[in-house]
Amino acid sequence: MQARFHTSWAELPASLQFALEPILSAENFPAMLTAEQVKTVKNISGLDDDALAFALLPLATACALTPISHFNVGAIARGKSGNFYFGANMEFRGVPLQQTIHAEQCAVTHAWLRGETNLVAITVNYTPCGHCRQFMNELNCGSELHIHLPGRPPSTLGQYLPDSFGPTDLAITTLLMDPVNHGYTLAETDPLTQAALNAANHSHAPYSQSHSGVALETTNGKIYAGRYAENAAFNPSLPPLQAALILANITGENCASIRRAVLVEGHNAVTSQWDTTLATLNALGCSAVKRVTF
């Protein structure tokens, strides 16, 4: 079991520990439970979906990186598939606070990168801020997404964000988590570049059409790729680097162990991810950063 889970693990009920132990002890635990694993854990622990998501929050919170605020937030995104996905807030020293990733963004993006195409609920240990409410309003489940908080009855995103502004106001019909493939190609065969290209092809950028992807290679040779997730309100958009960092951190990778990185984006894109990607990666100690355009 990853060391970051030890403290939270000790506080779990014995029945839940028994049910989760084979899952969390796996060498490459991906910070998610498949639908089949969720079913097994519920049968052993006696918890239903809602109670299990709340019980998993301390483990998700243990994935937080908060060198600035020291305020850890965890989230569990529940997919229509039945899978549960961990999320936690992430902060980075040496770059503007705008590069911060909120727990809800993390859980949603984690699910998206794992291939989930629709969410039914998100459970979080603190009320979602306005930024996160707007970010989640881009999802194809929209205002029907159920939000669960400790000590409160479940509510929908529509109740947390009444009279919202979203994709439909801009006549956008392809929403975040809808399957897409933009069909860009590159002659370059480098696996890291191809991973970034694949991410760009599945990115969500209906407002600027500035599709982009980032792939990170760590010192142990693993590759983590992230896609751009644009938002109708623009500012809550999640850059592709943040998406890649989410996947790396949530699975237990050290974000300071990035050996090289590739950004793939359009050569004449209206917006570019290059400057902020380079600055953030340099702050994380990675100087081998390349931009490739289609």
From Swiss-Prot:
Residues at which substrate binds: N89, M90, E91
UniProt xrefs under Pfam families: dCMP_cyt_deam_1, dCMP_cyt_deam_2
Gene Ontology CC: one annotated term: cytosol
Keyword Calcium attached: no
Active site: E104 (proton donor)
Cofactor: Zn(2+)
Catalytic activities: cytidine + H2O + H(+) = uridine + NH4(+); 2'-deoxycytidine + H2O + H(+) = 2'-deoxyuridine + NH4(+)
Source superkingdom: Bacteria
GO annotation (BP), single: cytidine deamination
SUPFAM superfamilies: Cytidine deaminase-like
Entry keywords, A to Z: Hydrolase, Metal-binding, Zinc
Binding-site residues for Zn(2+), renumbered to this chain: H102, C129, C132
Broad enzyme group: hydrolase
Domain (CMP/dCMP-type deaminase) ranges: 48-168, 187-294
Cofactor binding description: Binds 1 zinc ion.
One GO MF term: cytidine deaminase activity
EC number: 3.5.4.5
Keyword Metal-binding: yes
Function: This enzyme scavenges exogenous and endogenous cytidine and 2'-deoxycytidine for UMP synthesis.
Subunit structure: Homodimer.
Similarity remark: Belongs to the cytidine and deoxycytidylate deaminase family.
Protein name according to UniProt: Cytidine deaminase
Organism this protein belongs to: Yersinia pseudotuberculosis serotype IB (strain PB1/+)
Gene this chain is encoded by: cdd
